C-alpha cells in the first residue's frame, strides 16, 4: 500500500508560535455520558471512548491551526492517554491520528496516566533525553527552539535533585537563550478542586527554589483539567519540607490518598476521615508548608523584566474529562476558568516578548478568548 506524502513545515524562528495544550487524555470519557448513555461496560467501551476523544482532539487541533496557520510546534503538558499502567494502543492511535501532528514537531510531557507503562516511549523520540526523572515511560529531556530553551520534566518521579540536574545540563547547553520555559504535568500552582491543594502541589516546596535559582521564566502545567494563570511568583526564601508520593503495595499505581514527608517518612492523609483529628492536623500542616511563595507586586497584563515566574495550567484540549475549580480561588491565581469546553493557548515568542492567548472552542466550532492576552517583556 502506498501512502500519500506528508508535508512537514520548518518555519521561521524570529517569531515563534507554539500551540500549548493540556490533558488530551484520550479514552477518559469512558464511564461518562455519551449520547445519553454511560460507557460503563468494559467490552467495547474503551475503544468507543478512544474514538470519541480522538475525534474531539482532532477538532481542537484543526481549529487551532486554522486560526494560527504558522504554528511552529506543539507542547502537550501530559496525559496524552488515559489507561494508566495498561497497554493503550487504541488510545495512542487516536491521539496520533490528527493530520496536524504529522506537519510540525510535538513536545510531549509524561503525565501520571502515561507514566507507568512503556507505551509512551514507543511513540515519542525526545531530544536530549537524560537518565533523570525516570519512570517506565521515560525521563526528563530538553531542547532549544528560536529564542527559547525548553525543559521537560517527568514529575511523576519525585527526585527533585535529578530534575535540578536536568535543568543545569539544559541551561549549560544554551546559556544565552532569552526564555527558559519548563513543562511539567502536575500543576504545583493550579486552581482545580481535584489536585491543586493536594497531589498537584506535591513538589511545590522543592521545585519553587530550583526554578528560581535557574531563572526560569514560565512553567507550563496540566493535570487539573481546569484553566488558570498565576500572578508572578517566586520563593519565600524559607526552608520547607519536601514531599512525595509512593507506589501502592502491588506497584500498579501510586497511593494518591497519602503524601509522604521525604525526610521523616510521615504519611499525610489528603482526605482525612471525619473525626480523624490527627490526620486533619497533618493535612493542615502540609498545606501551610506549601505557602512557600511570594507574589510579585505587578499590575496589568503586561509585565516588564519581572523577578517572578508565570505558572500556567491548561484545561483539557479534547474535553474528554473536566474537573471543578476549587471553591476559594488561591491568592496566587490571577485568572481561572472552567466552562466545560475544550481549550488551548497560542504562545508567541520573540527575543523580547513572550505572549499567551488562550481560547475555548464553542459547540458551534467557533472560538472565544477566556482570558486577556498576557505578555512578558524583556529589556535586558
Descriptions of predicted regions:
Residues 1-46, 304, 322-327, 340, ...:
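Acidic, histidine-bearing metal-coordination/catalytic regions of metal-dependent phosphoesterases
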Residues 20-22, 73-79, 105-112, 153-154, ...:
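Active-site neighborhood of phospho(di)ester-bond hydrolases with catalytic His/Asp-centered motifs
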Residues 20-59, 125-133, 190-197, 322-337:
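Acidic/histidine-rich helix-loop elements
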Residues 54-116:
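Core catalytic region of metal-dependent phosphoesterases/phosphodiesterases
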Residues 59, 63, 67, 102, ...:
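C-terminal or late-domain output modules
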Residues 77-81, 174-194:
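Short acidic, glycine-rich surface-loop motifs adjacent to enzyme active sites
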Amino acid at each position: 500500500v502506498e501512502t500519500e506524502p506528508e508535508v512537514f513545515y520548518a518555519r521561521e524562528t524570529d517569531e515563534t508560535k507554539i500551540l500549548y495544550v493540556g490533558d488530551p487524555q484520550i479514552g477518559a470519557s469512558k464511564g461518562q455520558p455519551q449520547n445519553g448513555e454511560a460507557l460503563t461496560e468494559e467490552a467495547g467501551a474503551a475503544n468507543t471512548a478512544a474514538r470519541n476523544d480522538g475525534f474531539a482532539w482532532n477538532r481542537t487541533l484543526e481549529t487551532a491551526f486554522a486560526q494560527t496557520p504558522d504554528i511552529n510546534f506543539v507542547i502537550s503538558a501530559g496525559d496524552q492517554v488515559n489507561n494508566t499502567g495498561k497497554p493503550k494502543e487504541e488510545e495512542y492511535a487516536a491521539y496520533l491520528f490528527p493530520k496536524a501532528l504529522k506537519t510540525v514537531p510535538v513536545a510531549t510531557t509524561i503525565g501520571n496516566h502515561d507514566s507507568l507503562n512503556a507505551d509512551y516511549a514507543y511513540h515519542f523520540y525526545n531530544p536530549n533525553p537524560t537518565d533523570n526523572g525516570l519512570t517506565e515511560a521515560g525521563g526528563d529531556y530538553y531542547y532549544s527552539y528560536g529564542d527559547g530553551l525548553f525543559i521537560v520534566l517527568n514529575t511523576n518521579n519525585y527526585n527533585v535533585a535529578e530534575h535540578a540536574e536536568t535543568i543545569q545540563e539544559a541551561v549549560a547547553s544554551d546559556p544565552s537563550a532569552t526564555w527558559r520555559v519548563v513543562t511539567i504535568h502536575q500543576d504545583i500552582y493550579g486552581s482545580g478542586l481535584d489536585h491543586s491543594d493536594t497531589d498537584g502541589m506535591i513538589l511545590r516546596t522543592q521545585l519553587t527554589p530550583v526554578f528560581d535559582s535557574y531563572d526560569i521564566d514560565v512553567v507550563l502545567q496540566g493535570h487539573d483539567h481546569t484553566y488558570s494563570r498565576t500572578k508572578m511568583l517566586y520563593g519565600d526564601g524559607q526552608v520547607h519540607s519536601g514531599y512525595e508520593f509512593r507506589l501502592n503495595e502491588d506497584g500498579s499505581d501510586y497511593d494518591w490518598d497519602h503524601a509522604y514527608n521525604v525526610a521523616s517518612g510521615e504519611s499525610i492523609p489528603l482526605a482525612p476521615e471525619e473525626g480523624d483529628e490527627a490526620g486533619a492536623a497533618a493535612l493542615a500542616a502540609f498545606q501551610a508548608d506549601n505557602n512557600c511563595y511570594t507574589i510579585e507586586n505587578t499590575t496589568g497584563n503586561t509585565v516588564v523584566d519581572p523577578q517572578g515566574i508565570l505558572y500556567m495550567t491548561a484545561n483539557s484540549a479534547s474535553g474528554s474529562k473536566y474537573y471543578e475549580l476549587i471553591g476559594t480561588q488561591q491568592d496566587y491565581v490571577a485568572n481561572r476558568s472552567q466552562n466545560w469546553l475544550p481549550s488551548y493557548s497560542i504562545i508567541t515568542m520573540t527575543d523580547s516578548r513572550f505572549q499567551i492567548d488562550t481560547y475555548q472552542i464553542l459547540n458551534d466550532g467557533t472560538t472565544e478568548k477566556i482570558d486577556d492576552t498576557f505578555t512578558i517583556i524583556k529589556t535586558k
